[in-house]
Amino acid sequence: MRNFLHSFAALYAKTQASLTLQSLATFGLLLALSIGALTFGVTISCLLLAVSVMRTDVSILGNGPPMTLFLVFALSGLFNDPQLSLMVGVAAFISTPAIAAVGNRGTASLGAQTMSILSAWLPPGLLTVSLTILASRDRSLVALFLTLIYFHDLGLQLCARSPGFKRFSPILASTGAITLLWTALQISLSPIPHEWFWPFAALVGFGMPISRIFTELIVVQRWKAARLIASYMLTGPIWTAAALGLVL
């Protein structure tokens, strides 16, 4: 059991952005969110695009197709129309094998190349679309989500630096985020009803670990910059779905 906790904590805490970079990014997104949903959507799209271009180990030419698909899909969220975004996402998904076939030079199988391109644009695109649409409906829910992620990752980094707390860092970081969620609901900083605390607490407690492990095991093989947004990757779309289905 002790070895399992140590291995899980090591994998869980492996995908971390620098505290300074994450603080600046979170502040920038919250500032854009305070201006409006459109500004937020453009900002998060440009931010993820810039980070991926700066940190990718693939040439700009080779990185062009997945980043183009990402931008087209991500910016569809600006229209605040889930059906439109779904159609754009499906079209991009269907076109991915064709793009992989055109760019395949025999160094990898078509299936591997297709999955490589998909992992580079679909998860960050889905994150951007979902948060942009949610921002158009209720910006406070997006602000709460960004704050929860920030303090979760902050707690994770602080615990990971202490040998005594390192193996328990996933539990302590998630507990801190859930406590912050409870506090936000108690002082009515969010439209989430008090009776929905436990479903959203479960979302935070289980969504972040799943998101971080999924990112490390699958996404970062192609899109290295995914390490910077590991906690957001799957949690963002799930948070949006829960907010739209249960709150708004």
List each model region and its residues.
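Membrane-embedded alpha-helical bundles of polytopic integral membrane proteins
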Residues: 2-225, 236
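Final/C-terminal transmembrane alpha-helix of multipass membrane proteins
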Residues: 226-248
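Acidic/proline-rich low-complexity IDRs
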Residues: 1-4, 245-247
